[in-house]
UniProtKB/Swiss-Prot annotation:
Organism per entry: Pseudarthrobacter chlorophenolicus (strain ATCC 700700 / DSM 12829 / CIP 107037 / JCM 12360 / KCTC 9906 / NCIMB 13794 / A6)
Localization annotation: Cell membrane
Record-given protein name: ATP synthase subunit beta
Gene: atpD
Listed GO MF terms: ATP binding; ATP hydrolysis activity; proton-transporting ATP synthase activity, rotational mechanism
Gene Ontology cellular component list: plasma membrane; proton-transporting ATP synthase complex
Top enzyme class: translocase
Membrane topology (UniProt): Peripheral membrane protein
UniProt keyword list: ATP synthesis, ATP-binding, Cell membrane, CF(1), Hydrogen ion transport, Ion transport, Membrane, Nucleotide-binding, Translocase, Transport
The protein's role, per its UniProt record: Produces ATP from ADP in the presence of a proton gradient across the membrane. The catalytic sites are hosted primarily by the beta subunits.
Main location: membrane
PROSITE patterns from the UniProt entry: ATPASE_ALPHA_BETA
NCBIfam families referenced in this protein's UniProt entry, alphabetically: atpD
């Protein structure tokens, strides 16, 4: 007998079913006809493996008919057998919210990983599946979020209350830049931060935990992890768990919140795995047919309401450096600012390896950032673009064959490229150089001076991996001293 909508309404928490089939993380469960769980309901069962009893949680994903539901396990299914009883919780997965989550690490189910549940002061839990804020309650923002990183503040200014994407292939510095942003923005921000580790390395999660503790921001931060070794169902839902915690701070405590997600591609990848496990026909390049829908359900909840904001910074892995891949391409449409990391720039040792010509921002406009800032950003991009166009001629004929005007362009472009690099706090352990923060005023003045030719007398190596113009002058004095 196939369950009907009327019978779904009758389903209540505590209804018990039995496992009919287990295929990896996919579990089919048979329930009584009048107690079919709703889609997204959490199901639980207890198993004993190697003398240890543990609870396994599933999420209802499909109604198959004949009283069967298909669920995705959020933990390893080792030890599950047919006939094991399963209990319907009657509600979706929920996570703890409120001040009690600050300073702690949680998994997708809201279970603490650093302390026992009895040590937490939790009075409220929210379901992770929630509607986006009503259209009338939304509020746009054009206020710039200053980071102190020259290349970002000048060419791809971030928006307070906006969605920011850090795009890049493997090994170009996405996670380091996210960690740098946490160190800089969270420390200066003074509000609440939530970090979602989606399908990334467990080692990086531990590094982040230690760095946040050292930076003094851990006490105001909640961390939610679903790492690489977790089942796809966990990796698909962990971003929603973290977002739910952030929404509570925004909607109930009326706070401005920072939400860091690393990595959105792993969220998409987990959705593709779950879609395949559920037997859906794949779409382009093997991704799930509802890729845009899944991305929209997440991104539309990351928004600012009247008076309060969620500012999100999301790392997005670009497979094979292909920006036309459906995963990064689907994410682009939701973002207010995009920072694209270049393998070619990283190969020259220039960090952060931000591509100044392809990175964008919605507020790179004189009415939002001022005429001086905008004009300097445009001049910098024009010089870099002209230099890029001249590279083929230089490769064939050499720099000496260029016109005097073009030689000046190339010379200033090289200084700009070096000056866009900057020593960061996160990289100090590798470089031994203290990080620097440059105000937007000093950044604009510095690049204006380069574009105007005021610094043509300074060797380009003096601009490498420094902060403001004062650092350039000190570096230049050192170079002159060494060459005497």
């Amino acid at each position: 007998m196939t369950a009907t909508a009327t019978e779904h309404v009758a389903a209540t928490s505590g209804a018990t079913g039995r496992i009919a089939r287990v295929i990896g993380p996919v579990v089919d469960v048979e329930f009584p006809a009048d107690a079919i769980p709703s889609i997204y309901n959490a199901l639980t069962t207890e198993i004993t493996l190697n003398g240890e009893t543990k609870t396994i949680t599933f999420e209802t994903s499909q109604h198959l008919g004949d009283n069967l539901v298909r669920a995705i396990s959020l933990q390893a299914t080792d030890g599950l057998v047919r006939g094991t009883s399963v209990v319907d919780s009657g509600a979706p997965i929920s996570v703890p919210v409120g001040d009690g989550v600050k300073g702690h690490i949680f998994n997708v189910l809201g279970q603490p990983l650093d302390v026992t549940e009895s040590e937490l002061d939790i009075s409220e839990r929210w379901p992770i599946h929630r509607k986006a804020p009503a259209f009338a309650s939304l509020e746009g923002s054009t206020e710039m979020l200053e980071t102190g990183i020259k290349v970002i503040d000048l060419l791809t200014p971030y928006i307070k209350g906006g969605k920011i994407g850090l795009f890049g292939g493997a090994g170009v510095g996405k996670t380091v830049l996210i960690q740098e942003m946490i160190t800089r923005v969270a420390r200066n921000f003074g509000g609440t931060s939530v970090f979602a580790g989606v399908g990334e390395r467990t080692r990086e999660g531990n590094d982040l935990w230690v760095e946040m503790e050292e930076a003094g921001v851990l006490k105001d931060t909640a961390l939610v992890f679903g790492q690489m070794d977790e089942p796809p169902g966990t990796r698909l839902r962990v971003a929603l768990s973290a977002l739910t915690m952030a929404e509570y701070f925004r909607d109930v405590q009326n706070q401005d919140v920072l939400l860091f997600i690393d990595n959105i591609f792993r969220f998409t990848q987990a959705g593709s795995e779950v879609s395949t496990l559920l037997g859906r026909m794949p779409s382009a390049v093997g991704y799930q047919p509802n890729l845009a829908d899944e991305m929209g359900l997440l991104q539309e909840r990351i928004t600012s309401t009247k008076g309060h904001s969620i500012t999100s910074m999301q790392a997005i892995y670009v497979p094979a450096d292909d920006y036309t891949d459906p995963a990064p391409a689907t994410t682009f449409a939701h973002l207010d600012a995009t920072t694209e990391l270049s393998r070619e720039i990283a190969s020259r040792g220039l960090y952060p390896a931000v591509d100044p010509l392809t990175s964008t921002s919605r507020i790179l406009d004189p009415q939002y950032i001022g005429k001086d800032h905008y004009n300097t950003a445009v001049r910098v991009k024009q010089i870099l673009q002209k230099n890029k166009e001249l590279q083929d001629i230089i490769a064939i004929l050499g720099v000496d064959e260029l016109s005097e005007e073009d030689k000046i362009v190339v010379s200033r472009a090289r200084r700009i490229q070096q000056f866009l690099s900057q020593n960061t706090y996160t990289a100090k352990q590798f470089t031994g150089v203290e990080g620097s923060t440059v105000s937007i005023k000093d950044t604009v003045e510095g690049f204006t001076a380069i574009c105007d030719g005021e610094l043509d007398h300074i060797a380009e190596q003096a601009f490498f991996n420094v902060g403001g113009l004062d650092d350039v002058e000190r570096q230049w004095a050192k170079i002159q001293e060494q060459t005497k």
